[in-house]
């Protein structure tokens, strides 16, 4: 009888741990949807195009052209490492995201824009995407996360990121 109660307790504890993990990971699953983007981080979506823009940050430079259509955003350009990130020999990972923002400054959709693969030796990459655009999108914003690494016995690593919120 006592063994059964212990097992029931372990079962309940397991369910609680799993529930907590699901809640904790929900931020990664949902991304930044609903979060407020500062006005300085918003790029108003001009109609038509192509329009040329540059987004300079501490660690990357995103140079891009976009054409804004009613239900789609065509965007292409180049991602280049900058600042401290460009001093490392290779990229462990680099992910750049595009965020559609509504008229209230809230993120309504997140789209992956570009990803560099593990051990990529590049410093500049090109991308081209056709992205379904939400009807309520009035501006866009960008964010990234990455890790670069040196070669040799030290193999120093440098993590870098920026979000629009």
What function would you assign to each model-found segment?
Residues 106-152:
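Short, solvent-exposed, Trp/other aromatic-anchored flexible loops in extracytoplasmic proteins
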Residues 22-42:
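Bacterial Sec signal peptide processing site at the extreme N-terminus
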Residues 36-46, 132-134, 138-165:
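Surface-exposed edge beta-strand/loop patches
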Residues 39-70, 78-80:
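Low-complexity, acidic Ser/Thr/Pro/Gly-rich terminal tails and inter-domain linkers that flank the onset
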Residues 89-96:
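Short coil-to-beta strand junction motifs in C2/discoidin
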Residues 78-88:
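Short amphipathic, basic-aromatic surface patches that mediate peripheral association
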Residues 96-102:
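Conserved aromatic beta-strand anchor motif in extracellular beta-sandwich/beta-rich domains
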Residues 1-25:
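Sec-dependent bacterial lipoprotein signal peptides
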């Amino acid at each position: 009888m006592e063994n059964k109660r212990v097992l029931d307790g372990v079962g309940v504890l397991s369910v609680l741990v799993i529930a907590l993990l699901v809640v904790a990971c929900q931020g990664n699953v949902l991304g930044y949807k609903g979060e407020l983007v500062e006005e300085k981080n918003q790029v108003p979506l001009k109609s038509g195009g192509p329009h040329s823009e540059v987004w300079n940050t501490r660690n990357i430079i995103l140079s891009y052209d976009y054409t804004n259509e009613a239900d789609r955003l065509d965007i292409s350009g180049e991602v280049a490492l900058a600042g401290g990130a460009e001093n490392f020999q290779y990229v462990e990972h680099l992910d750049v995201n595009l965020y559609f923002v509504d008229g209230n400054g809230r993120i309504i959709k997140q789209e992956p824009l570009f990803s560099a693969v593990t051990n990529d030796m590049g410093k500049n990459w090109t991308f081209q995407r056709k992205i379904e655009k939400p009807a309520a999108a009035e501006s866009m914003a960008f964010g990234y996360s990455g890790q670069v690494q040196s070669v040799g016995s030290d193999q120093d690593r440098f993590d870098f990121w920026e979000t629009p919120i």
